């Protein structure tokens, strides 16, 4: 039997294609490790108009070509900020053919009224948005709420809690809210921010800037972000090492008696109640 050979050279993947593949690999790694997508799911994809949430939506749209047994609905909260371009997302989502809902809620006025001069607005804004999104999730009957936090968000939150709250706590990839009504997932937790930024430029997403808090300088989150960036420059791959540490915990070498029984010298086997306490400057992108 004769074999047919070809001298045709297959083109190498472009940098953009390599980046897309890395993002999809990271997305699926989180999905598989934490069971973020299950048969019959109806997932509410929270869309702010920023690079992270646009990328998350794209990942879910692609995921539906692989798994066809779940639904998505994109939800945007219009907080009635001045000069907010409210036409952009409906036009974009209609063009994509994605099922969506725009929720109009004037949280902007509340944040402006309640935040003292010189203080950052992130915490209150986040709580108000979270409440509105949870109410919308209940109304729509979704099984999961998807948020677009990425790897750097997780690391920054870990150090913010460590430095300013005295807690070793980051952002879970999946958790249930205190009232037991909602499951929240973060499918981008393994995705790197710079890869998301590159993807956003490549896809030419119609980015909507946050004029409420984006102009606030000297926030602790920005300082922490710079600290991590400086570490990465001085010690390449430092962020990856720290991130891996979040998956490699030794309770017996810390001091939390809920995690380790120091009297009997054994790990706790009973399920711990999740402490879903507010995070330092946590936000929904």
Swiss-Prot record:
EC number(s) stated in the UniProt entry for this protein: 2.8.1.-
Keyword annotations of the record: 4Fe-4S, ATP-binding, Cytoplasm, Iron, Iron-sulfur, Magnesium, Metal-binding, Nucleotide-binding, RNA-binding, Transferase, tRNA processing, tRNA-binding
BP-aspect Gene Ontology terms: tRNA thio-modification
Free-text comment on the cofactor: Binds 1 [4Fe-4S] cluster per subunit. The cluster is chelated by three Cys residues, the fourth Fe has a free coordination site that may bind a sulfur atom transferred from the persulfide of IscS.
Record motif PP-loop motif, residues: 48-53
Residues involved in [4Fe-4S] cluster binding: 122, 125, 213
Highest taxon above the source species: Bacteria
Pathway: tRNA modification
The keyword Acetylation is assigned to this record: no
Keyword 4Fe-4S listed: yes
Self-association state and partner proteins as the record states: Homodimer.
Miscellaneous comment as given in the Swiss-Prot or TrEMBL entry: The thiolation reaction likely consists of two steps: a first activation step by ATP to form an adenylated intermediate of the target base of tRNA, and a second nucleophilic substitution step of the sulfur (S) atom supplied by the hydrosulfide attached to the Fe-S cluster.
Family of the protein in this entry: Belongs to the TtcA family.
UniProt function note: Catalyzes the ATP-dependent 2-thiolation of cytidine in position 32 of tRNA, to form 2-thiocytidine (s(2)C32). The sulfur atoms are provided by the cysteine/cysteine desulfurase (IscS) system.
Protein name: tRNA-cytidine(32) 2-sulfurtransferase
Organism for this UniProt entry: Cytophaga hutchinsonii (strain ATCC 33406 / DSM 1761 / CIP 103989 / NBRC 15051 / NCIMB 9469 / D465)
Record lineage: Bacteria, Pseudomonadati, Bacteroidota, Cytophagia, Cytophagales
Gene: ttcA
């Amino acid at each position: 039997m004769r074999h047919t050979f070809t001298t045709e050279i297959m083109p190498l993947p472009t940098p953009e294609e390599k980046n897309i593949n890395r993002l999809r690999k990271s997305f699926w790694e989180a999905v598989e490790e934490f069971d973020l997508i299950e048969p019959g799911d109806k997932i509410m994809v929270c869309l702010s108009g920023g690079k992270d949430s646009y990328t998350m939506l794209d990942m879910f749209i692609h995921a539906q070509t692989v798994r066809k047994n779940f639904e998505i609905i994109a939800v945007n909260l219009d907080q009635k900020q001045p000069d907010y371009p409210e036409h952009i997302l409906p036009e974009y989502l209609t063009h994509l053919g994605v099922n969506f809902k725009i929720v109009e809620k004037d949280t902007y006025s509340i944040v402006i009224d309640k935040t003292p001069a010189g203080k950052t607005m992130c915490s209150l804004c986040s709580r108000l948005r979270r409440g509105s999104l949870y109410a919308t999730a209940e109304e729509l009957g979704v099984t999961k709420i998807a948020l677009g936090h990425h790897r750097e968000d997780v690391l920054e939150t870990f150090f913010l809690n460590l430095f300013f709250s005295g807690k070793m706590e980051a952002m879970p990839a999946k958790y249930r809210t205190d009232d037991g009504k909602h499951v929240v997932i973060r499918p981008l937790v393994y995705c790197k921010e710079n890869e998301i930024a590159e993807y956003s430029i490549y896809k030419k997403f119609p980015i909507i800037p946050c004029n409420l808090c984006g102009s606030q300088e000297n926030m602790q989150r920005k300082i922490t972000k710079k600290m991590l960036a400086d570490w990465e420059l001085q010690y390449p791959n430092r962020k990856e090492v720290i991130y891996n540490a979040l998956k490699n915990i030794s309770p017996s070498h810390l001091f939390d008696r809920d995690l380790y029984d120091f009297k009997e010298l054994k790990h706790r086997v009973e399920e711990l109640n999740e402490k879903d306490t507010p995070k330092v400057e946590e936000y929904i992108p």
